[in-house]
Curated annotation (Swiss-Prot):
A cellular-component GO term for this protein: outer kinetochore
Family of the protein in this entry: Belongs to the SPC24 family.
Top-rank taxon, per record: Eukaryota
GO biological process: attachment of spindle microtubules to kinetochore; cell division; chromosome segregation; mitotic spindle assembly checkpoint signaling
Gene for this chain: SPC24
CDD domains per record: RWD_Spc24 (cd11565)
Highest classification ranks of the organism: Eukaryota, Metazoa, Chordata, Craniata, Vertebrata
Protein name, entry field: Kinetochore protein Spc24
Length: 197
């Protein structure tokens, strides 16, 4: 603004010079002053242009920084969505694993119960093999020696089959327990036993 005031002052001086028809010295002085004002104006203009270029450069840098920041925010949003999706998947997987663990725990408990039951049965079998089976084998051998009957254990259910090895001949046994009473079958088998033994 000061430069424009100086120009206005110089212009008024020139007008007064022309109007008053003053001396040449005053004209030179005013022309010199006019040149100084023009130089100052040009310097000011150069400075203003330089400042304007700097401001434009700064604006471009700020705009680029803003664009970079927006891109980073966008990338951050995408990464956040990916992390949230991953977190949701991890939560679902955790739920599936917990359900699977619960199922496996139940199965383990069932297996432990089965194992305990098997151990109990094994103990009972051990008792049977040490006490019951030897005595049953002894009784079966005794019955075989007394009755001389060789049993067919592979016959169909409900049938009593075997061979009685009597004193003179072997006689087949073929009885249907669904049509005959137990008493009849027992009496018949005992009737085969030789009384002279």
């Amino acid at each position: 603004m000061a430069a424009f005031r100086d120009i206005e002052e110089v212009s008024q001086g020139l007008l007064s010079l022309l109007g008053a028809n003053r001396a040449e010295a005053q004209q030179r002085r005013l022309l010199g002053r006019h040149e100084q004002v023009v130089e100052r104006l040009l310097e000011t203009q150069d400075g203003a242009e330089k400042q304007l270029r700097e401001i434009l450069t700064m604006e471009k840098e700020v705009a680029q920084s803003l664009l970079n920041a927006k891109e980073q925010v966008h990338q951050g949003g995408v990464e956040l969505q990916q992390l949230e999706a991953g977190l949701q998947e991890a939560g679902e997987e955790d739920t599936r694993l917990k359900a699977s663990l619960l199922q496996l725990t139940r199965e383990l408990e069932e297996l432990k119960e089965i194992e305990a039951d098997l151990e109990r049965q094994e103990k009972e079998v051990d008792e049977d093999t040490t006490v019951t089976i030897p005595s049953a084998v002894y009784v079966a051998q005794l019955y075989h020696q007394v009755s001389k009957i060789e049993w067919d254990y592979e016959c169909e259910p409900g049938m009593v089959k075997g061979i009685h090895h009597g004193p003179s001949v072997a006689q087949p046994i073929h009885l249907d327990s669904t049509q005959l009473s137990r008493k009849f079958i027992s009496d018949y088998l005992w009737s085969l036993v030789d009384t002279e033994w």
